[in-house]
């Protein structure tokens, strides 16, 4: 299932590593350093013209780092609700 992150960006729920609120997480120096390093590597993509509220870390096999970070104007609470609004696929056991 795909989750709309804002603007015209949607990602597969399986590729989302984490959804983080910028107001609370950027209080940590480690988070600020992580985002700064990702920005330098070109792994940060802003998908908003407004002040971002959330950053979303996703797997991206096309990038050298293996991940991409989206900055979104949609709150982390809303994105989390969207991610759980669809049922998770059941694992099917092989009948051998």
Task: Locate the predicted segments by residue.
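Eukaryotic intrinsically disordered, low-complexity regulatory linkers and tails enriched in Ser/Thr/Pro
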Residues: 1-96
């Amino acid at each position: 299932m795909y989750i709309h992150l804002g603007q015209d960006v949607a990602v597969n729920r399986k590729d989302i590593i984490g959804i983080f609120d910028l107001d609370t997480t950027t209080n940590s120096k480690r988070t600020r350093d992580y985002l700064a390093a990702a920005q330098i590597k070109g792994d940060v993509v802003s998908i908003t013209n407004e002040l971002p509220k959330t950053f979303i870390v996703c797997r991206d096999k096309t990038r050298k780092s293996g991940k991409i970070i989206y900055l979104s104007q949609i709150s982390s609470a809303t994105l989390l609700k969207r991610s759980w609004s669809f049922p998770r696929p059941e694992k099917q056991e092989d009948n051998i």
